[in-house]
């Protein structure tokens, strides 16, 4: 027997006379309590997005799926639910969670709670674990060799050992206090986000399947991505990189390498690039003539004296302020909607692209402009 009453405005629901009920979905109502003690046949229970402050599932020993996220639960006892394979209890106020009896669990999503510890050593079938946005100081996943997806970001982890998790494809551990991270055995990784930790080095040479890498806001002095040829997103800003070689990463569409110590940047092989941010470095030149797919280009706060944008007709957002440009020609950039070229040495600015009225964000202050060429004098007067 199934009952689906999701997305209503129910404040009460009585299912006490339905002992044969197997499927109950009352997601997205205004329930403050729910009694399922008589529903011993339940295998699926979804009570997410209600206002429950307690939930007793001790009688529901047949449960395989329990979704109780976005409530006000302060505790949850699932010790009797040994058949559970999926448990979603995220966005509650749980301070502890005991899943030691739930050895069949394949998915555990408990993020956005107040957990200070989490023991998943008994959950050897676990393929997906999301425990981010808690207060965890440690996490042992050494027995979880089936893990494919691990999100443990925004905790207080000082170390993370994923050497046993060779099936891992997705690892998100940003906003912790990690000083090292060894991913050499995780050769199936396609996504790695270790941003905002305290990493001084990162070896991704074994991760040849990586498509997305975010290692920004660390203390990296070098980064070798030559083995990561499928990479299409690389975020490595706010580190201490003195050089960056992306010549092998021809699939790159997004590259954020701002706020480093780069003196040069060669993106001539990265013809698929649509978004490039390399601001706050020490670049004296930048060649983007091969990057015809660029829609966003930010290279402010460098030492660039000239830039040729004639090939970049798709650029919509251009930020080139605080350089040493003496002239700027955006006449070919007919998609331009935002231009920030302040704090340069501009004496000449060519905006004769025929579409000046579409530029909604324009800043050319603190220059020495004597001429701005446009096709629409009325626009110049009003802007």
What is each residue range found by the language model?
Residues 1, 5, 11, 32-33, ...:
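Intrinsically disordered, low-complexity repeat tracts
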Residues 1-3, 22-26, 43-47, 64-68, ...:
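Conserved hydrophobic beta-strand positions in leucine-rich repeat
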Residues 8, 29, 50, 71, ...:
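Consensus "Asn ladder" position of solenoid repeat domains
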Residues 17-21, 38-42, 59-63, 80-84, ...:
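Leucine-rich repeat
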Residues 22, 53, 64, 72, ...:
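Low-complexity tandem-repeat tracts in intrinsically disordered regions
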Residues 57, 75, 96-99, 120, ...:
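Short linear segments in intrinsically disordered or otherwise low-structure-confidence regions
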Residues 347-383:
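Leucine-rich solenoid repeat scaffolds
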